[in-house]
Amino acid sequence: MEQATQQIAISDAAQAHFRKLLDTQEEGTHIRIFVVNPGTPNAECGVSYCPPNAVEESDIEMKYNTFSAFIDEVSLPFLEEAEIDYVTEELGAQLTLKAPNAKMRKVADDAPLIERVEYVIQTQINPQLANHGGRITLIEITEDGYAVLQFGGGCNGCSMVDVTLKDGVEKQLVSLFPNELKGAKDITEHQRGEHSYY
């Protein structure tokens, strides 16, 4: 059993909420935080009770004021920078769990450009496009510094693709990688340019 070096941020309100729930369970019960399908677009985070007999040797323990959180070693890197809060609104209170790295593990600053761009697409750009039922996939980065993107879902064949690409996605990528990326291209435009002379 390892002690975690980095804690998941659990707000005081959320800790109090967990303590109240744990008081109704058998003594020695703590919580487990996990990710189902980690590293995929379908990743889901969850919290469950963790009775004393459910702690695994390979689990990582994070100690809080009145309880511990146990995390399996597979989920751990995907829960980096995760935050749990208990928010009270007019309609009642709810637990919120934000895990920006659940769908994709955080990449190092010195990772290859394609990995860093892919990480930004999965964690920042695709969540915005998901509101419109769309998503983009990074196909390659050309030698002259263009990210070649494929639009899928609701974006595919949509007349707004050019606007979305040029105004939103391209600006965002170039501003994040100013010295490495010159711009972005839609794969259909990229292929059309390459194959139009046959």
Swiss-Prot record:
Amino acids binding [4Fe-4S] cluster: C155, C158
Superkingdom of origin: Bacteria
Cofactor: [4Fe-4S] cluster
Keyword set includes Mitochondrion: no
Function: Involved in iron-sulfur cluster biogenesis. Binds a 4Fe-4S cluster, can transfer this cluster to apoproteins, and thereby intervenes in the maturation of Fe/S proteins. Could also act as a scaffold/chaperone for damaged Fe/S proteins.
Subunit structure: Homodimer.
The protein, known as: Fe/S biogenesis protein NfuA
Gene behind the chain: nfuA
